[in-house]
Amino acid sequence: MRAGYITEYERAVLIDEIGGHVTAAHSFWLFSHENPDGDSLGCALATYAALRAIGRDVKVLTTEPVARMYRFLPHHDKITHTTVLPPGLPDVIIVNDTGNFHRLGSTYEDQLTARGVGPNAKPKEPRCTLINLDHHVGNELFGDINLVDPSCAACGELFYHLLRQLKLPFTVDVAINIYAAILTDTGRFSYANTNKETFRIASDLISLGVDPYEVVDRVYNTRTPAQIKLLAKILDTMTIDGDQYYFYCQVTQEMLRVTGTVMSDTEGVVDTLKTVENFDVCFLLKEEGDGRVRVSARSNDRFDCNTFARRFGGGGHPAASGFTMRATLGDAPHLLSDALRQYRQEIARKRQPMQEPQR
């Protein structure tokens, strides 16, 4: 079963249900997807700030360090970077901006499943409630409570409604994190999913003390020389397939080594690639060094990244998605090309008109 659109009333009912658990619970673990972006980090940190303000015990857990561009976010230093979860379980686990449980990454998925949490856990641990908060169409509804609202341009919008309705403390720290979440997931309010509600929420956050210039400047206009050198190396790998109207760039472990950077320093690079004209889709292939290649995809309105990413167990939005390939960086482009060709052929067949039956 996958998520579809819900009404404002249905959203309000689910938020009230979540509120009951927030009131009753003392301990919380907050998770984002692998390689957390601005939306997922902003939501987790806003929730951390709000729950700590009412005296709850809260942990934000990630396997990767926070990307440099997000290290100005309030409470980013409270994030626990670990591959081993703390012992036991909290009263509530909140997973945000994550279309399926696998997107937590096998490191966390396996540990939680073994402790009785998640869709594949047998038996389930009844004393821990798993809350799934997301805005992606096709979310696999893996939680005990699933609040998924695809009408929200960013997960940050959903968390804005959640925190407002539950009347949790909405400090300036909360507001900055929510604003950064919305800003980054709407491409600086430029993507097609941006609407008047997005701007209304942004306006309210500014009234609470957010400096929009500072947030934009810290996220998009603060790069180190090493990051620029890395970007130059990435762009030098640009490979074009004119027949299929796509191109890709690569990030190797060697590039990271010689420039003194880490993979999180590639955050935002794929959005730069999207600005190249006359292509339906572009990909950034990132060598993880463990037999996997992580792929970020961006497209125009002629190509559905989300549907394509699902072929590899990933997902996201029609114009921006991600997935992981079990392959070497040398093999990944060929697998990608073959999958694209097959995908386009399937789409073409679906668009062919039905033939009249012969009489």
Locate the predicted segments by residue.
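Short acidic-hydrophobic, aromatic-tinged amphipathic segments that line or gate anion-handling sites
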Residues: K78-T83, L147-P150
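Short alpha-helices
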Residues: L133-I201
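Hydrophobic/aromatic beta-strand patches that form the interior of the parallel beta-sheet core
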Residues: L61, V92-I94, T129-L133, I145-V148, ...
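Active-site cofactor/cluster-binding pocket
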Residues: T82-D144
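Hydrophobic helix-and-loop "lid/oligomerization" segment in the mid-to-C-terminal part
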Residues: R2-E34, G42-R71, H81, P86-P90, ...
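Short glycine-rich anion-binding loops that position phosphate/pyrophosphate groups of nucleotides
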Residues: N35-P36, T98-F101, H136-G138, Q253-E254, ...
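Short glycine/serine/threonine-rich phosphate/pyrophosphate-binding segments
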Residues: G38-A44, F101-G105
